[in-house]
């Protein structure tokens, strides 16, 4: 049998950390653009503010540690963390919240444990949980998508509301001053309606829902899905974790929907609501805090998907990805210990 042999050299090129981070950031852009289109300029302002704070904190910590500031900033990890925090919080959250969350992510979660490659938890999700637990009202106050809002804030309006230093912050002023802009997310709305005794069909008759998914959120998730597929094509991430997350969430939500369609949302709703695609391709795939073996990555991803469904349906926080990712981060060493690949010539561990 004749074998086809490729010409030399046979050495594959390893991607540098900065290159991987650049690719992830570029693939995030479609989702960021669509998110800004539906939820206004506030998202972009939050992202830019987070980047400034993250790079400043990164430089300050490197200076204190007598490390190269240029090398640390050029790996783009701080910028990626900042973007993930910026797109995760409500567009018109007060400025001090994004500052607090970003400082916590970079200084405490990342560098307190030794810097890039040593952190135990995903910095962006740890920051999100800190803000959500500390300021639940502000963190659950999103603005209505532009397609259903009576008024859409301009760039100037967004800046004024974000940087308002009043006691209640920009979002509170928004609720009092402009009708038809602030509202709960589809996940929050559905969970509240179900607790009041409404069926899924009755809840989804509201204007915030369209075609079984949330208005705006379907397209945001679709954009992050497109970016994630490009990321897979570029081989910046492996397919195991993303597949595990989506499969775990799909299977769990399908079982729930089949058992009780009147009180459970469809798998389509779960897959294209909240931060599902963002988390599946850009957050859960963090190589530092995830499991390492192929089989371990699948288990890690599936665990996140199942936890998301359980927390969304039984917990107090409808979009549960931050908690699910952090809990899976805790389980990653355990998964790696019991799902180690067998070394050639040795028995299984």
Swiss-Prot record:
The keyword DNA-binding does not apply. Its cofactor is FMN. It is found in: Cell inner membrane. Pfam families: NQR2_RnfD_RnfE. One of its GO terms (cellular component) is plasma membrane. Its EC number is 7.-.-.-. One of its GO terms (biological process) is transmembrane transport. Keywords: Cell inner membrane, Cell membrane, Electron transport, Flavoprotein, FMN, Membrane, Phosphoprotein, Translocase, Transmembrane, Transmembrane helix, Transport. The modification FMN phosphoryl threonine is found at residue 185. The chain crosses the membrane at residues 36-56, 77-99, 124-144, 212-232, 239-259, 265-285, 291-311, 315-335. It is a multi-pass membrane protein. It comes from the Bacteria. Part of a membrane-bound complex that couples electron transfer with translocation of ions across the membrane. The complex is composed of six subunits: RnfA, RnfB, RnfC, RnfD, RnfE and RnfG. HAMAP family: RsxD_RnfD (MF_00462). Belongs to the NqrB/RnfD family. This is Ion-translocating oxidoreductase complex subunit D. The gene is rnfD.
